[in-house]
Regions:
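Short, structured coil segments at secondary-structure junctions
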Residues: 25, 78-79, 99
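Structural motif
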Residues: 38-47
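C-terminal binding/interaction regions
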Residues: 2-11, 89-169
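Helix-adjacent hinge/juxtasegments
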Residues: 48-85
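A short beta-strand-loop structural module common to alpha/beta enzyme folds
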Residues: 28-39
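Glycine-rich phosphate/diphosphate-binding loop of Rossmann-like nucleotide-binding domains
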Residues: 1-25, 29
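Alpha-helical segments flanking ligand/cofactor-binding loops in enzyme cores
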Residues: 20, 47, 51, 73, ...
């Protein structure tokens, strides 16, 4: 798989170690910076990596900053991105299995190197469970990206519930 990888200055060292892990696992790594521990702004790094996923230039992205929160918020501003801030293997697996997350965010100030490695490996080897409630919920997330209230729309037919009700009268 092609994995976009980015970090700010606080996540730089972890990014370098994760890049090695990904390469060892046979993934193509798109290193999108930063390339030093010099202070930088995480939105400048999160956006291009998330956009690479949204534009299908990367299959997934892994973003790292001190808390993981800034990267997560920025990535989730990009249409088509479902970024998940994960702190353990269970949240990594659930974000993929139930939410079809395509961007993994990590907190370098919180997680140790071995745990980060396990989270990344677990996240990349867990597949989405298509169909049923999880797929419906992911479609509802896409409605939100379009500025629509998912409670007002039938995601199976794309019609507003009021419109569907009017058609049945």
């Amino acid at each position: 798989m092609k994995i976009a990888l980015a970090a700010d200055h606080r996540g730089h060292a972890a990014k370098e170690r994760i890049a090695i892990l990904l390469s060892e696992q046979g993934h193509e790594v798109l290193d999108m910076g930063t390339n030093s521990a010099k202070s930088c702004d995480y939105p400048d790094l999160a956006y291009p990596a998330a956009k690479a996923v949204a534009d299908s230039k990367a299959d997934f992205a892994v973003l790292i900053c001190g808390s993981g929160i800034g990267m997560d918020i920025c990535a989730n501003k990009v249409d088509g991105v479902r970024a998940a801030l994960c702190h353990d293997e269970l949240t990594a697996q659930m974000s993929r299995r139930h939410n079809n997350a395509n961007v993994l965010c990590l907190a370098s100030d919180v997680l140790g190197e071995e745990l980060m490695r396990r989270i990344v490996s677990s996240w990349l080897t867990t597949d989405f469970e298509p169909g049923g409630r999880h797929e419906r919920r992911v479609r509802k997330m896409a409605w939100i990206e379009q500025g629509r209230d998912p409670a007002l729309y039938d995601v199976d037919d794309g019609l507003a519930k009021d419109d569907r009700d009017a058609d049945s009268r």
